[in-house]
Amino acid sequence: MIKKTSRIHGWSEAKYWGFIRSCLRRAFQRYPNKYRTQASAKRVGGKYECNLCKKEFRAKDVAVDHIVPCGTLKSFEDLAVFADNMFCEIKGLQILCKACHKTKTLHERGMSDEDIKVSEFRKLPAKQQKEKLSMYINDVGKNQAERLKQYRELL
């Protein structure tokens, strides 16, 4: 099968729009409203309060989140909505700790709480998976597939 290419250097549509999306995300890093959101949320002592869990974090442990997701960017028709959502007003942005931001993003992508927990468990080294499971069951699975099944049953 011939790979569909329609852009410069033989890029596929997906690669081309991924590149455009990446450029827009990099531009957001310098967007004034991002800095204004951070500045207005800063507490005494340089800490920030997560808008979801309400705990305080250092600057390196928080992210500026779009309240309304930017959406997909897979074609020219998506570009205007994506850019409008990306470069929104300050009221469309919030400060989240990295853990809450990751969870919110995965929910927006359609993952359930259970799927997120299993995904995090899967990333643990085998030794830590076994330790975590051994607190609840006696016969811990010998391979990752068995341990994932056991973990999912515990949830």
Q: Which residues are covered by each model-predicted region?
A:
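Histidine-centered nuclease catalytic patch
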Residues: 55-92, 108-110
